[in-house]
Amino acid sequence: MNNLTNPSKLALNSSLTKTGRRKTSIATVQLFPGNGEFTINGISGIEYMQQKEELIFAIQEPLHFLKLKNEFNLIIKVKGGGLVGQVNAIKLGIARALCEFDLTYRNSLKLKGFLTRDPRCKERKKYGLKKARKAPQFSKR
């Protein structure tokens, strides 16, 4: 982690790295000063998200909310889970990095719910049941 002399400004050659998680997805987000481009696992973010506008917008939502869309470049490494779980993990990582960048963003991001980690995960299957909660059919006679 870089110790910045002025916590509200990021040096041109430095970056902030934060982690976000959702279900089984883990995303590591690097935030650089730039022009709004983002890459995911070495591929353009738009290409990685298969041109799906709602997923692309969801990734950039914390930046849109703070009106910083064209201020930062993002390098994202994500693994595990499906696309939606990965998007939510990335979104949490971006929000955490923005808080590290400037503490004044923390309250507005927290009120909007960007800093809340969603704890819901798949429930494990129990023995004697067909799925996590589905029981075999019961017959009285």
From Swiss-Prot:
GO molecular-function terms, A-Z: RNA binding; structural constituent of ribosome
Keywords recorded for this protein, A-Z: Chloroplast, Plastid, Ribonucleoprotein, Ribosomal protein
PANTHER family reported in the protein's UniProt record: RIBOSOMAL PROTEIN S9 (PTHR21569), SMALL RIBOSOMAL SUBUNIT PROTEIN US9M (PTHR21569:SF1)
Protein name: Small ribosomal subunit protein uS9c
Gene: rps9
GO annotations of cellular component type: chloroplast; small ribosomal subunit
Database matches in Gene3D superfamilies: 3.30.230.10
Similarity comment text for this entry: Belongs to the universal ribosomal protein uS9 family.
Entries under Pfam families matching the protein: Ribosomal_S9 (PF00380)
Compartments in which it is found: Plastid, Chloroplast
Domain of life: Eukaryota
PROSITE patterns with a match to the protein in the record: RIBOSOMAL_S9
GO BP term, example: translation
